[in-house]
Amino acid sequence: MITPLDFIADLFNPSLAFLPRALAAVLLASVVTGVVGCHVLMRGMVFIGDAVAHSVFPGLAVAFVLGGNLMVGGLAAGVVTAILVAIFSQNQRLREDSVIGIFFAASFALGIVIISLAPGYSGSVQDFLFGSIVGVSNEDITHAAIMGAVILLVLWLFHRQIVTVSLDRESARAMGLPVLALDIVLYVLVTISVVLGLQTLGNVLVLALLVIPASAARLACRRLGSMMVFSPVFGGLCSVVGLYLSWAFNLPTGGTIVLSMVAAFVLVWAVTAIRSRARAQLKN
């Protein structure tokens, strides 16, 4: 069995250069999705992570048929779909999750139609959708770091306004806030953060990083600011543990990281439940 010390030594082994790159990729994703996930959870649109992964398909299909860059094609399709969802969600008679489902289902269907016209598509497109964390390049890390910094900067600049819209849209409109523009900003940021992680981490791991750490933070913290600190730390620690376990026992990396997060979430849930019960007994 590979011990934690052996794992640390392997991280500095030049012949295993893919291992520290995989660790860097998952840690960067943990930080970005940890913060973005808090907004997603507060907004009640947990479904969006999986939906975005499907919405990129038309862009992937067009990029593949034309011989273009899959990342650029997927990102363009995801952003366009996100903007359309934000616009149509302004109708108060439509639930936001309903609009998400309609547009992202349509996007995926369109992608299937386009890609079916091109033979030999399965390999490269599947790599994008399901990820290859051990195949992360230095260029992938650089791109993720730059875009992650941009996402966090924009969220920091518009934090108060986005939170206000998420909590009470009518009050936000009464205050004169540009609700549509802020919706577009949030949707586009979520889309970019998900698409950036798809090619390296895959759909399942990105969705887990978007939802599980933020949910654990919601249980453990009372304030949004504390959640946005707890969530990335939770995701990062679980990712390190999951990567170690997958390396030590020769298990699938993405699945092991997800299971590590689920186990940690259950632990947080149990601890908070016990703590809440103890407080209730003290009050009585």
Regions found by a protein language model. Name each.
Residues 1-31:
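Membrane-interfacial amphipathic/re-entrant helices at transmembrane-helix boundaries
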Residues 17-26, 124-152:
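Loop-to-helix entry region at the N-terminal start of transmembrane alpha-helices
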Residues 3-15, 120-136, 244-247:
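Membrane-interface helix termini and inter-helical loops of multi-pass transporters
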Residues 22, 70-78, 97-101, 144-145, ...:
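Loop-to-transmembrane alpha-helix initiation sites
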Residues 204-255:
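Transmembrane alpha-helical segments in multi-pass inner-membrane proteins
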Residues 251-284:
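Cytosolic-side transmembrane-helix boundaries in multi-pass membrane proteins
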Residues 38-121, 217-229, 246-250, 272-274:
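Short loop segments and helix-boundary regions at transmembrane helix junctions
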Residues 29, 141-213:
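Helix-loop-helix "hairpin" substructures at the membrane interface of multi-pass membrane proteins
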